């Protein structure tokens, strides 16, 4: 398994996938239902999070995004189905608000043991068209597992939390 990521099992079908080796210490969450799995955020994009996800589930994956900041969308490039809040569609598809050089500086500002295949000169901020737009109150059904979208703007215009009432989990 890729040593860049740390996987912690929260319950039988919920996993935290973390990047503890970087100062940002980003966390993504994999929730497996009966029909599909949801990956909440994809981290920094320093290493391929898809390889880790594929060791945990064979279900189809929908990526849902808490917000469009570089440390939450870096691994979006490894997935086909991405959902974001409607207020951040343009940030994802065309107008990311932070220049690439600022992001690269933030990525490298503190020393860490990057994977050998990571090259900062090739690092890009993910840009793409989301396959689904999220709205406050939307329900995402994974098959015997359901998330409710809660729009929580402030950190960014389209910031969202995701609530799973049956387990009382808030992501």
Each predicted region: which residue ranges?
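Conserved beta-strand hairpin/beta-sheet module of binuclear metal-dependent hydrolase folds
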Residues: 3-55, 161-171
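Short Pro/Gly-enriched beta-strand edge/turn motifs at strand-loop
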Residues: 9-15, 118-122, 143-145
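Structural signal for conserved beta-strand scaffold positions within catalytic alpha/beta enzyme cores
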Residues: 9, 16, 65, 83-84, ...
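Residues that act as N-cap/strand-start positions at coil-to-secondary-structure junctions
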Residues: 1-2, 23-25, 126-128, 134, ...
């Amino acid at each position: 398994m890729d040593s860049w990521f740390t996987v912690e099992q929260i319950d039988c079908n919920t996993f935290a996938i973390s990047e503890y080796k970087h100062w940002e210490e980003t966390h993504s969450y994999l929730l497996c239902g009966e029909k599909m799995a949801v990956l909440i955020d994809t981290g920094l994009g320093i290493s391929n999070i898809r390889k880790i996800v594929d060791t945990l589930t064979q279900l189809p994956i929908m990526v849902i995004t808490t917000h469009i900041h570089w440390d939450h969308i870096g691994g979006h490039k490894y997935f086909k189905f991405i959902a974001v809040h409607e207020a951040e569609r343009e940030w994802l598809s065309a107008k990311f608000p932070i220049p690439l050089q600022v992001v690269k500086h933030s990525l490298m500002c503190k020393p860490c043991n990057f994977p050998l295949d990571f090259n900062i000169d090739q690092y890009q901020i993910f840009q793409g068209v989301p396959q689904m737009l999220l709205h406050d109150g939307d329900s995402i059904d994974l098959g015997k597992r359901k998330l409710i979208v809660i729009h929580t703007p402030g950190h960014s215009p389209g910031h969202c939390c995701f609530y799973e009432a049956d387990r009382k989990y808030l992501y």
